[in-house]
Structures are given as C-alpha cells and as structure tokens.
C-alpha cells in the first residue's frame, strides 16, 4: 500500500499536470480566436475577388486571352496540399492527406505533380512514395500573403508553361471551432459557375492584361 507521502507526491504531480494542461488550453484557445478573427476578416475580400474574376472571365476582354482563363484537356494535374508543420492538431493534417490520396488515385507522376505546404503532408506523402515537386514549410503558425504568393507563383508558372493543365488546392475549410472540412478546389483555370451573372462589362485600367496578370 502506498504511504501517505507517496500519495501526497502523486496528488501534487497530478495537480501540476492539470495546471500545465489548463495553461496549454488557454494558449491554444487564444491562438484559435486570433486565427478565426483573421480568417473571418479576409473571407469577404477573398470571396469578392473570386466573384469578380469569375465575372471577368465572361466579359469583353478586347481579344485578350489570359492563360488563367484557358481551359484545355487535362493530362496532368497540380495538387497543392496544405497542412500543418507539427502534430497535436487532431485530424487536421490526416483528413487533408486522406483527401489528397483520394484525389491522386492511381495517377502516375506523369499525370500529377505535388506541391506541399507544411511538414506533415510532405513527410506523410513522401513516406507513401509520392513524388513531391516542391515543398514549403515553417510558416503554418503564421502564414502570410508572401508565403501564399510564393506557392501560387510556382503553381502558376507550371500552368503557364503547360506542364500542368489544372491546379487543385487541397486544404481545410474552417467552418467553426468544432467543424473543419477537408476540401479540394480547382483554382486554375478560372471557371464560371452556372449561377453567375454572365456578360457584365468591366472597365480595365490600364488594360485587361495588366489586371489579370497582376
């Protein structure tokens, strides 16, 4: 039977662990609130930009043809897989990984290329012998516009050089703190949804090429 001293040490150890766990929970909650606030602040802007680009795709571009609007037979697909740098994130990275594997299916490296953001998707896909064209990591805690721009510039260059025929981003769509959904979204070429208003006229300053290629 444990002595009274052993019991006191055990109680103290459990109490200390509870305090540490509580502190970790408070830090995680604060970081989640900050991340959610940033996501909520940028979402209307991103949605509006997407809507404008889709409208532009059916407007009069004065004979200018942007590679962003060029639709062609899909022989090779670029997948951008976005996950975390570290673990302890529940199913955040594993759900994205599962969806990425489903999307790639039985494709050979001649039929796909992979760009990963985050160490977890990179390591997981590499361990499964998928060829990774380019990887980025070290910024999942504090992603910035510049980080996103570097990734997109690489994917765009592949698309413009006809090395890939479409670009699909696989990421986690944040709904609320309890619900996050792994999602695959085609971002190139730009597509016009059936419910969008077609044929709107836009004034381009200085010209369509400068606007669409910015």
Language model: regions and residue ranges:
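C-terminal beta-strand-loop-alpha-helix "lid" module of Rossmann-like NAD(P)-dependent dehydrogenases
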Residues: 1-214
């Amino acid at each position: 039977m444990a002595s009274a001293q052993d019991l006191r040490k055990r109680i103290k150890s459990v109490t200390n662990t509870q305090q540490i766990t509580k502190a970790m929970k408070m830090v995680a909650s604060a970081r989640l609130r900050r991340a959610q606030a940033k996501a909520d602040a940028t979402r209307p802007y991103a949605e509006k930009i997407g809507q404008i680009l889709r409208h532009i795709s059916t407007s009069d571009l004065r004979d200018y043809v942007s590679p962003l609007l060029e639709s062609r037979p899909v022989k090779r697909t670029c997948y951008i897989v976005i996950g975390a740098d570290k673990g302890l994130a529940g199913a955040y990275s594993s759900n994205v990984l599962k969806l990425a594997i489903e999307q790639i299916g039985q494709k050979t490296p001649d039929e796909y290329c992979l760009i990963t953001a985050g160490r977890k998707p990179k390591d997981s896909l590499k361990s499964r012998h998928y060829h990774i064209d380019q990887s980025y990591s070290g910024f999942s805690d504090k992603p910035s516009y510049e980080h996103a721009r570097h990734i997109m510039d690489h994917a765009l260059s592949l698309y413009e050089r006809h090395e890939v025929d479409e670009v699909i981003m696989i990421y986690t769509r944040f709904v609320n703190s309890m619900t996050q959904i792994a999602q695959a979204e085609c971002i190139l070429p730009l597509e016009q949804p059936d419910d969008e208003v077609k044929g709107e006229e836009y004034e381009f300053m200085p010209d369509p090429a400068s606007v669409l290629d910015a």
